[in-house]
Amino acid sequence: MKRSEINRILKSSEDFFTSQNWRLPVWGYWTWDEWLARSALELDEILTQEMGWDITDFALGDFERKGMVLFTVRNGSTPATGYDKPYCEKLMIVNDGQLCLTHFHWDKVEDIINRGGGTLNLRLNNANADESLDMANPVVVYIDGIRRVLDPGAVLSLAPGESVTLPQRNYHSF
């Protein structure tokens, strides 16, 4: 992606967060010079845990169709990293017509919360022991604490304000 495209997406993302009354941590607004003025020790958790902006087209060169914007506020980790947080918090922007590629997390339980902007559609499958898509067994998730059993590969739609808890090894794309 070209730097000019990344800068345009960053500005648009900041505007969207503002329109939804979301504020980033103070370091989410720092200039390059403000980052450089900080010590590595002061920034260790942010850098080690890969927190902050992530604008990706998944190396496919088609951001408008296969891409997304993330701002990682907290990132789950194991005690070995020195930052024992078995959870993460990420603000994500997926535009109409965009797709976040299918993936799962080995160790993290994930809450996906639609904070606003439109309906979020997720396709859900379990992972088999060999990490292939399980097309045979139902998917159990909790939507705002309410247990739902879905067919494998079902599309779950979340309206603004709704959330879903995805267990470990749950394939999802949105």
Regions found by a protein language model. Give the residues of each.
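Short gly/pro-enriched beta-turn/loop segments at secondary-structure junctions
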Residues: 86-87, 107-108, 115-117, 159, ...
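Active-site glycine-rich loop that binds ribose-phosphate moieties when present
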Residues: 140-157
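Conserved short histidine dyad/triad with adjacent acidic residue
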Residues: 73-77, 90-110, 125-130, 157
